[in-house]
């Protein structure tokens, strides 16, 4: 268990999220489980699980059964709330107001053109997929303090000539 409190649903974004988010976050808070602990129990990446909680990812039938077990939510409730397609990209206002989320936005603002140029030089004309994609968050510690390490891994998709 982490020495930090578990993440809960922020009231300001709750109205923009599906009912499943409220159900999942309520159970997460009640059980005092981190996304890492839930991910381990479900057998998924913690970012994928968090995205599912925020309505930004689709749950498989296996995910639903595992979430039901770890969070003590009836499987029928999760099946009814998680069986549809996610409505991605609507949970945040732009630009973001939360300082941490804004820093991620700022990284793209500041380094996006540089990332694009370097990726084009390495791969050619195309884009990095956010569908054939994985990501993870790691914590590193050294003599200067604690560091957040975010890895983004997306399949390279070259533009087609036509």
Curated annotation (Swiss-Prot):
It holds the Pfam family Cyanate_lyase. Keywords: Lyase. The keyword ATP-binding does not apply. GO terms for biological process: cyanate metabolic process. Catalyzes the reaction of cyanate with bicarbonate to produce ammonia and carbon dioxide. Belongs to the cyanase family. It comes from the Eukaryota. It catalyses: cyanate + hydrogencarbonate + 3 H(+) = NH4(+) + 2 CO2. This is Cyanate hydratase. GO terms for molecular function: cyanate hydratase activity; DNA binding.
């Amino acid at each position: 268990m982490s020495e930090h409190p578990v993440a809960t649903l922020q009231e300001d974004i709750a109205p923009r999220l599906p009912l499943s988010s409220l159900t999942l976050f309520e159970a997460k808070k009640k059980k005092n489980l981190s996304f890492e602990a839930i991910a381990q129990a479900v057998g998924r990446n913690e970012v994928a699980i968090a995205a599912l909680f925020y309505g930004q990812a689709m749950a498989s039938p296996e995910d639903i059964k595992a979430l039901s077990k770890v969070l003590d939510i009836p499987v029928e409730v999760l099946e009814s709330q998680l069986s549809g397609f996610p409505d991605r990209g609507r949970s945040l206002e732009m630009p973001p107001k939360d300082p941490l989320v804004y820093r991620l936005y700022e990284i793209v603002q500041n380094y996006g053109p540089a990332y694009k140029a370097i990726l084009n030089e390495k791969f050619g004309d195309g884009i990095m997929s956010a569908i054939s994609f994985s990501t993870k968050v790691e914590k590193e510690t050294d003599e200067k303090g604690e560091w957040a390490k975010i890895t983004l891994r997306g399949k390279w998709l070259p533009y087609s000539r036509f």
